Amino acid sequence: MSVSLILHAFLFIIAGNYKEFWQRLLSNKWLFILLAFWCLHALSLTWSTDLNEGWDGLRVRISLVFLPLLYIGTLSLKQQQIITYTKILMLAIVVVIGLNVIHYGVLIQNNLALDIRQLSWFGSHIRFGILVAFSGVLAFNLWKKQVISTLILTAYLILILMYTVYSQTFSAILSASFVMLIIGYDLIRSTRFSRRIGIGFILVVGITGAIAIKLIATPNPACGTFESDDEARKAWALRSDFPLDSLDRKGQGLTRTAERYLCANEVALTATSIQKLSKKDVLNIENGFTSRHSANGGIWSRLEELKFELHEAKDPNGHSLLQRFAYWKTAWAVINDHPWLGVGIGDINREMENKYNETGSTLKPENRNRSHNMYLTTWMGVGVMGVLLLLWGICYFGWIGFKEQHLVLLAFSVIVFFTMCLEDSLETQAGASFIGFFIAILCGQHARTAWTTKNY
């Protein structure tokens, strides 16, 4: 938590209006769901053996409760404040996007860009990507209030969509898709041509989705091996200081990287093909890229990687999707052993590591992580009751957003619900603070009125 928040809390403790705070708490009874969720994690310390790990987990998760309690209990959010804060956030996002792109461009020019996550210069690649996608519905809210023009909204949506696609972050792409669907739903609902537009919109989304699924489900053409390993090594030695039987800069086998790169170029796997490679091609292979698409980045690069992971890769190490499958399988095995109370918030890492060893996981030690699924992590830590509380809270916020036509809250709830399937959203300070902050400014009774009041 920031110094300003700690100071705010300290001043409230000294001179706060406790009666008003209690009344606000009672008028926002959903806060008790957050309190129960955190208290259940605190209680799980009694059956945890690693108390240091447990206390650290509680410290991170306290932002989820502390921010809503402090904001809703002591502040009254006005519509003009919402407009001002949203403008500042949008401006900050545009500036950071610009700096990220410039920085990444410099890395590319100097052949230092090895991973798309280097695009995010200032923090978590995934978290910033989700924030960028979510900001689309914030901009749409300003447009509905006639604060920004259609031109500005369109330009902003195009910018964040282009950045999201280029970032190759699946959670961000998923979030942006939901934001676009919710914006489309609201536009359709408010027009007299809703049926025709709705049918057309559904057809476009359906056809686009079908094409994407078809592309991913279709395996790449089989890629063999070099016709002569000796000749390939000799030809490669004339082009690069990296031995062909060594590793590329990503830690992958250089021979296989070169073979896949040549296959992507649709040329024969021969020494002659190696000799015809450009200097840029050789550098791409040294950097671990398996095609010109993957070296250039973008959504096509991510689709190629997904196809390879699903249809060809055998070793999960270094492949994000296959590693997640391994995480989920291991986490589920831990849950099967402790379904009701979990292992305690402090013992999740230990039990995951024990299960990796017990099942003979092929993941390398540095790739053996937690589940990357907040529902599984919660179930492992505090049992089935924790998962039910988590789902109850998210679904309640989504229902309120839908019932009150609070599109920002609806989008936030849908994004949180689905991204928690892919990320341990509450396991980092940034993630817990992100969710806690937006719960605080979106879900309170006074805040909901300010967000949904029309000024046109």
Model feature map: region roles:
Residues 381-414:
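Hydrophobic transmembrane alpha-helices and their immediate junctions
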Residues 30-37, 51-75, 88, 93, ...:
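Aromatic-anchored transmembrane helix interface
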Residues 1-43, 77-87, 142-151, 193-200, ...:
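Transmembrane signal-anchor hairpin modules in multi-pass inner-membrane enzymes, especially those
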Residues 5-11, 64-73, 127-141, 436-442:
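Hydrophobic cores of alpha-helical transmembrane segments in multi-pass inner/ER membrane proteins
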Residues 1-3, 56-60, 119-133, 168-171, ...:
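Membrane-interface micro-motifs in multi-pass membrane enzymes
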Residues 308-337, 341-382:
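Long extracytoplasmic/lumenal interhelical loops at the membrane interface
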Residues 6-12, 180-183, 194-199, 390-393, ...:
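Transmembrane alpha-helices of multi-pass inner-membrane enzymes
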Residues 9, 42, 83-113, 122-252, ...:
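Alpha-helical transmembrane segments of multi-pass inner-membrane proteins
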